[in-house]
Each structure stands twice: as structure tokens, then as C-alpha cells.
């Protein structure tokens, strides 16, 4: 799995859209989560979808759009319609945290990641099962390992050395975190979690341990 992480927009919808396009097109994330709680991504996606289909972008209106666009269209125009609809569907890969206090749990095989806007709201129940703790509220991009846990934040979307992060599961089951700068370059990348292969049981003095 490849999970994109997009930092808060800081009232900059233009840059937010550019970073969302980067996550979808360049990083090819399976899904992406916006870590702000200002509703900015909802607004960006709404306008983006409307721009693509030049009308009501809802699923329920797809047949109406098809009738209007394709009834007397050329093959080239039909291909353009289908391309726009595919892109509209792709926008569903962009998600938001449900609300300011919400936690979202993501599973990479046996690795648990908890996503939240403000890490100050993390409690013991959040931290115990999690190997990766992702948060949005941060002035700087962060990859910081403490023991077996990693704290990760992409930082604001306008940050020159961050704004976007990617959690990617590798072939060996390790999870790698990468930070991407505003120019699309990799700023930092490291393995932040390894799969739990299960505890080994040994017997010493007749007692299992």
C-alpha cells in the first residue's frame, strides 16, 4: 500500500491542489489523507471535479453528463469525456480526517499507523498499538523515531522541505516514510516500521516464556 499524507493548506488552495496532483500523479498513492481540519481539501476537490466535467460532478449525474457530451460526439470527444470521468473518479482517493479530534487507523500488514491532526490529543490507547503516529499540526516536516515508534508529519503544504509525505509498504513488509519538498524532490526517506513477525516462544526450566 502507498498512503499519501498532505499537510494543512494554511489558506493556500492553489498549492494544496498542486500537492494533491503530485500525490496522485507522481507518487501514485493508492489513497491520500489531508491532515488539516479546515475543510480546504473538500473545497479544492469540489471545484476540481466541477472543472473536469463542466457541470454537476456527482455520481448520480453521470448518465446525464454522458448523454449531453457523447450523443453526437466524435471519437476524440468521447475519449476526452471518458478521460475526465476517470480523473473525477480518481479524486475519490483524496480523503480528509472526519473532524478535528478524529483519529484514523491505517494498517500496513501488521504495522498500525494512527493519523490525527493534533498530536497533543494522542492518548495511551492511541499509542499502545501504533508503530507510526502521523499528525498534521506542525510548523516543520518531521520524521522522528523514539524506540519502536515513529512520529511523522509532512508539515504545511507550503513548506519548502515538506508538505507531502508517503508511507509505502515495501516487498519485505517494512514501511518506509518519505518527505517531499515543494519542488517534488525527496527530502528525507527512511524505514520507520517493521512487520511484527510474531513473538518467539522458548522454554526454560520447564516454563514457557
Model-predicted regions and their roles:
Residues 1-53, 66-69, 86-94, 100-102, ...:
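N-terminal active-site segment of His-dependent metallophosphoesterases
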Residues 16, 44-46, 126, 145-146, ...:
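Short, well-ordered secondary-structure micro-motifs
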Residues 5-8, 31-38, 65-66, 73-82, ...:
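Active-site neighborhood of phospho(di)ester-bond hydrolases with catalytic His/Asp-centered motifs
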Amino acid at each position: 500500500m502507498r498512503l499519501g499524507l498532505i499537510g494543512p493548506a494554511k489558506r493556500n488552495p492553489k498549492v494544496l491542489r498542486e500537492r494533491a496532483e503530485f500525490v496522485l500523479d507522481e507518487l501514485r498513492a493508492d489513497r491520500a489523507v489531508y491532515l488539516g481540519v479546515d475543510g480546504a481539501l473538500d473545497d479544492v476537490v469540489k471545484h476540481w471535479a466541477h472543472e473536469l466535467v463542466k457541470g454537476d460532478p456527482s455520481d448520480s449525474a453521470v448518465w446525464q453528463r454522458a448523454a449531453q457530451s457523447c450523443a453526437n460526439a466524435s471519437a476524440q470527444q468521447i475519449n476526452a469525456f471518458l478521460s475526465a470521468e476517470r480523473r473525477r473518479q480518481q479524486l475519490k482517493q483524496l480523503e480528509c480526517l472526519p473532524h478535528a479530534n478524529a483519529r484514523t487507523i491505517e494498517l500496513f500488514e501488521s504495522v498500525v499507523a494512527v493519523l490525527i491532526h493534533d498530536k497533543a490529543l494522542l492518548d495511551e490507547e492511541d499509542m499502545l498499538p501504533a508503530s507510526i503516529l502521523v499528525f498534521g499540526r506542525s510548523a516543520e516536516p518531521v520524521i522522528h523515531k523514539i524506540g519502536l515508534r515513529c512520529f511523522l508529519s509532512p508539515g504545511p503544504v507550503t513548506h519548502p522541505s515538506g508538505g507531502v509525505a508517503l508511507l509505502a509498504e515495501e516487498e519485505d513488509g517494512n514501511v518506509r516514510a518519505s518527505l517531499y519538498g515543494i519542488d517534488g524532490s525527496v527530502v528525507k526517506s527512511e524505514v520507520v516500521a517493521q512487520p511484527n513477525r510474531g513473538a518467539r516462544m522458548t522454554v526454560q526450566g520447564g516454563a514457557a516464556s
